Amino acid sequence: MYFPIEKPDVWGIFKKRLNRFVGLAEIDGVETLVHIHDPGRLQELLFPGAMIWARRKQRGKTQYYLTAVELDDELVLIDPAAHNKVTSWLIEAGFLLRGYAIERYEPAFGKGRFDLLLRGPNGQRALVEVKGVTLEAGGRALFPDAPTSRGARHMEELAKAVTEGFEAHVIFLVFRKRAKVFSPNWEMDRKFAEALVRAYRSGVYIHAVKLEMFKWGLRYIEELPIDLLAL
C-alpha cells in the first residue's frame, strides 16, 4: 500500500535560490524560475547541481512547481501542499492513530487554524498539526531547518487546546531514508524546541512518521522514536 504522488512533468538541474519561494533551475536546457513551496532553508537538498523534479504551472511568475529532489540514493519530497493528504492517508489506512476518523480539514481554533480535526474511537475531538521534515544529520531527523515563529505558536495553541478539552497531536512527516530518531532542532530554533517540550508536558502527543519516496509515491516505513532533549 502506498500514497500516490502526481508524476512530475520534468526534471532539471538546480542553480540557485533567489528568495524563500523562488529558485533558478535549468530545465530542457533553459534557465527558468521554479516555485519552492517549502520556506525552509533546504541547504542540504537545494544546492547548485542538485537534480530536481517539477510540475508545470499554468499561471504566475514562475513556470514550474518544485516537487522533489533526487539525491544519489533517495528521493526527497518537497511539497508541503501534500502534507495534509499524506497524513489523511496514514490515518485512513490505519498506519497512524488507528480508530480515528477525519472530521474536518483546517479547523479554526483561537485566531488560527490547525490542519485536521479528528474524532477518536471514544468520541473525543482531536486537533492535529502536521509538519514536514527534510533535514537529517547523523541519522537524526530535525525540525525546523529555519527559525519558525509560526511553528512555535502552533505548539502553544496545541497546548491551549488540551486545556479546553481537546486531544492534541503534532505529526512530523519525515522524508529522509537514513533517519532513525526525531528531535527538535535546538541549534536552529530554540524557541520552537522549547515550545514543543512545553506542549508535550501539557499533554500534546508527538508522532514522527518515516516515509520513503519512490517514483511516484510514498511508502510508510515506521514511526520513529522521539528525543526531545537538547543535543
Curated annotation (Swiss-Prot):
Any one GO molecular function term: DNA binding
InterPro entries noted in UniProt: SfsA, SfsA_C, SfsA_N
Pfam families: SfsA, SfsA_N
NCBIfam families to which the protein is assigned, alphabetical: sfsA
PANTHER family: SUGAR FERMENTATION STIMULATION PROTEIN A
Family under the similarity heading: Belongs to the SfsA family.
Protein name: Sugar fermentation stimulation protein homolog
Organism listed in the record: Pyrobaculum islandicum (strain DSM 4184 / JCM 9189 / GEO3)
